[in-house]
């Protein structure tokens, strides 16, 4: 069977529904529009049956769809940050005095994969200040620490091993991970933010399966945030072929032999054929927008502000920005 590569729970549900023409047992879906043109979708996987169908762990997956002009509008960016913060606050059940560790996953040398390290560079980190300036930084400020551990190819160390060692040493009460994801649809690239309470597997979106970073492996809750920055080239080619076939079917005379041939093409077999044809030439090629540098810069700011607001509930964004500046 042709498996479409995606990290987004909302897309996994769409693929299943399209393939089997029914909803998934054990999965609850809720969609709402907040603020201006910002859509929030909650996908709750409740049991093993739902997890197997979705190919994702049991838990909540929040998808925030943002307008395509967000990256060029500071006001909309701040609105999205507050939506991200509100979604995070629903998943973070942590007293203010407890420590949070934020981890920016990804390779800072590869732009589509650099969103995690970029977010870390924009965070309000306070754990060290709580120790060296206790008279100035009061109990209303949460101790937050952050790290961008790089990738296995740079460090020679599994990212999960680095994080586990840090957790054992500094003993945080929560880990928040940020990583780049893969999407099934081009229109979701850099326009979707996924938040989940199930942890993350670094590199899974592009086929590099590493050690899981979740509550089971670390012993504390793990919140994962991700933004799709790449799409599988075979998926793009398959979608383009679907558009061509649909148009040819619309133009053909219904009931005629050519119409019947087009209408009976197995889309699953077509997908596998395109994948096998492309493999010798491009392998696992991933495609990203040409303006990805600007996109990563703006999306990382949105996510960093959202995390800052969620982890520091006693501060407003204006005060956080003053602190950072």
From Swiss-Prot:
Statement: the UniProt record of this protein carries the keyword NADP: no
Reported modifications of this chain: Autoproteolytically processed. The inactive tetrameric zymogen termed p46 autoprocesses to a smaller form termed p41, which is active only during spore germination.
Entry annotated with the keyword Hydrolase: yes
Propeptide: 1-7
Gene Ontology BP term (one): spore germination
Reaction catalyzed: Endopeptidase action with P4 Glu or Asp, P1 preferably Glu > Asp, P1' hydrophobic and P2' Ala
A Pfam family the protein falls into: Peptidase_A25
Alphabetical UniProt keywords: Hydrolase, Protease, Zymogen
InterPro entries, per the entry: Pept_HybD-like_dom_sf, Peptidase_A25
Subunit structure: Homotetramer.
Function, as annotated: Initiates the rapid degradation of small, acid-soluble proteins during spore germination.
UniProt name for this protein: Germination protease
Organism: Clostridium perfringens (strain SM101 / Type A)
Lineage: Bacteria, Bacillati, Bacillota, Clostridia, Eubacteriales
């Amino acid at each position: 069977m042709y498996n479409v590569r995606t990290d987004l729970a909302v897309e996994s549900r769409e693929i299943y529904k399209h393939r089997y023409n029914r909803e998934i047992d054990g999965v609850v879906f809720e969609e709402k529009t907040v603020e201006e043109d910002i859509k929030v979708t909650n996908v709750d996987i409740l049991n093993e049956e739902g997890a197997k169908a979705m190919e994702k762990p049991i838990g909540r997956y929040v998808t925030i769809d943002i307008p395509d002009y967000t990256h060029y509008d500071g006001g909309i960016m701040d609105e999205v940050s507050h939506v991200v913060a509100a979604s995070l606050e629903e998943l973070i059940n942590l007293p203010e005095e407890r420590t949070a560790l934020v981890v920016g996953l990804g390779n800072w040398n590869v732009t589509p994969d650099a969103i995690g390290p970029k977010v870390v560079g924009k965070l309000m980190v306070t754990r060290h200040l709580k120790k060296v300036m206790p008279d100035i930084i009061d109990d209303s400020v949460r101790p937050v620490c952050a790290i961008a551990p790089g990738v296995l190819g740079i460090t020679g160390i599994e990212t999960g091993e680095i994080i586990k060692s840090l957790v054992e040493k500094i003993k945080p009460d929560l880990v928040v991970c940020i990583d780049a994801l893969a999407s099934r649809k081009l229109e979701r690239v850099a326009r979707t933010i996924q938040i989940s309470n199930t942890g993350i597997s670094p590199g899974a979106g592009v086929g590099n399966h590493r050690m899981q970073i979740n509550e089971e492996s670390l012993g504390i809750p793990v919140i994962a945030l991700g933004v799709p920055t790449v799409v599988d080239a075979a998926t793009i080619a398959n979608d383009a072929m679907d558009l061509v076939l649909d148009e040819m079917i619309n133009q053909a005379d219904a009931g005629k032999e050519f119409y019947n041939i087009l209408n009976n093409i197995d889309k699953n077999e077509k997908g596998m054929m395109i994948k096998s044809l492309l493999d010798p030439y491009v392998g696992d090629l991933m495609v990203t927008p040409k303006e990805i540098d600007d996109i990563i810069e703006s999306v990382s700011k949105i996510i960093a502000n959202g995390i800052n607001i969620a982890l520091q509930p006693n501060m407003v964004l204006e005060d956080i920005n003053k602190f950072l500046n």
